[in-house]
Amino acid sequence: MAATEPILAATGSPAAVPPEKLEGAGSSSAPERNCVGSSLPEASPPAPEPSSPNAAVPEAIPTPRAAASAALELPLGPAPVSVAPQAEAEARSTPGPAGSRLGPETFRQRFRQFRYQDAAGPREAFRQLRELSRQWLRPDIRTKEQIVEMLVQEQLLAILPEAARARRIRRRTDVRITG
């Protein structure tokens, strides 16, 4: 470590020390002494699993010294917060009056009212529509059959005459129409 002290004094940063100047770096023919004083080499860290990206390159495993110098280069303070798209921000907004959660009708309206001009290009529009559809249809908790039922009911309400639509809305919503 004596060889690195002038470099540390000149640069003020251990990150500027070349790796070959660090203790234990480079090729040495003598094994390092562990804390007990024997001349046996220290136990190496466990080998990475073959499926990991570092499996073929054992040198890619950071040493504690390299990790410490990398930590000194990290910026101090909070990381910049990215602005979430409007649809995601609205979905995370506080619940409405009386602590009610946003229902499927709210998410359906957001999906149906989305316009291409709200997005920055076709890929972003696709991504936002996909997210809005997931919030509305909830494929994580609903079956395909339930999702189809929701879509058919919505389309039926859209094509029914006004009088029939008013009667349909007053009826029970748990009655299935497709089977």
From Swiss-Prot:
Pfam families: SCAN
Known role: May regulate transcriptional activity.
InterPro entries linked: SCAN-C2H2_zinc_finger (IPR050916), SCAN_dom (IPR003309), SCAN_sf (IPR038269)
Assembly, per entry: Interacts with ZNF202.
Positions with biased composition (Low complexity): 52-80
Compartments where located: Nucleus
Extent of the signal sequence: none
Species per Swiss-Prot/TrEMBL record: Homo sapiens
Keywords: Nucleus
Domain SCAN box stretches: 108-166
The keyword Lipid biosynthesis is assigned to this record: no
Segments for region (Disordered): 1-104
CDD domains (alphabetical): SCAN
SUPFAM superfamilies: Retrovirus capsid dimerization domain-like
GO CC annotation, single: nucleus
Coiled coil regions, renumbered to chain: none
Any one Gene Ontology BP term: positive regulation of DNA-templated transcription
Major location category of this protein: nucleus
Name of the protein this chain belongs to: SCAN domain-containing protein 1
